Amino acid sequence: MFDFGFSELIVIAVVTLIVVGPERLPKVARTAGHLLGRLQRYVSDVKSDIKREMQLEELKALQQQVEQQARELESSMRGEAAKIEADVNKTVAEVKSGVTVDAAPVPLTHAVEAPAAPAPMSLAPHGDAASAGREPAAVPGSGPEKA
């Protein structure tokens, strides 16, 4: 801060001793120390205030940048939503134009019959009396074939 050498400090101490006197010198030195301490605290407070203001300015710039990006994102999202809405409206209009409200329902030209019930199946084993009167089914390739 100050560029005083040792010899310059000795000269200042001797002049102060002569001017103030040996009786009041300790009290003056204590007061000077308190004043110097206050000065150092004041300087450090000013430095911290300046640093805080600089950080505040940086934060404001960052906030503005984030807000700008948010506005850009919002506008692009609104544009995309408008495109999608237009596509949906176009599709709805196409569907509405293809379907007419006045169209009568088309009557059925033939009746659908219910399928016939399946024939009951025998649960009896192969070798019992229920199947004794029937012939076994022909296995392809095992007997004479008619051409």
Swiss-Prot record:
<keyword id="KW-0472">Membrane</keyword>
<keyword id="KW-1003">Cell membrane</keyword>
<dbReference type="InterPro" id="IPR003369">
    <property type="entry name" value="TatA/B/E"/>
</dbReference>
<dbReference type="GO" id="GO:0033281">
    <property type="term" value="C:TAT protein transport complex"/>
</dbReference>
<keyword id="KW-0812">Transmembrane</keyword>
<dbReference type="InterPro" id="IPR018448">
    <property type="entry name" value="TatB"/>
</dbReference>
<keyword id="KW-0653">Protein transport</keyword>
<dbReference type="Pfam" id="PF02416">
    <property type="entry name" value="TatA_B_E"/>
</dbReference>
<keyword id="KW-0811">Translocation</keyword>
<comment type="similarity">
    <text>Belongs to the TatB family.</text>
</comment>
<comment type="function">
    <text>Part of the twin-arginine translocation (Tat) system that transports large folded proteins containing a characteristic twin-arginine motif in their signal peptide across membranes. Together with TatC, TatB is part of a receptor directly interacting with Tat signal peptides. TatB may form an oligomeric binding site that transiently accommodates folded Tat precursor proteins before their translocation.</text>
</comment>
<keyword id="KW-1133">Transmembrane helix</keyword>
<feature type="transmembrane region" description="Helical">
    <location>
        <begin position="1"/>
        <end position="21"/>
    </location>
</feature>
<keyword id="KW-0997">Cell inner membrane</keyword>
<comment type="subunit">
    <text>The Tat system comprises two distinct complexes: a TatABC complex, containing multiple copies of TatA, TatB and TatC subunits, and a separate TatA complex, containing only TatA subunits. Substrates initially bind to the TatABC complex, which probably triggers association of the separate TatA complex to form the active translocon.</text>
</comment>
<feature type="region of interest" description="Disordered">
    <location>
        <begin position="117"/>
        <end position="147"/>
    </location>
</feature>
<protein>
    <recommendedName>
        <fullName>Sec-independent protein translocase protein TatB</fullName>
    </recommendedName>
</protein>
<dbReference type="GO" id="GO:0043953">
    <property type="term" value="P:protein transport by the Tat complex"/>
</dbReference>
<keyword id="KW-0813">Transport</keyword>
<dbReference type="GO" id="GO:0008320">
    <property type="term" value="F:protein transmembrane transporter activity"/>
</dbReference>
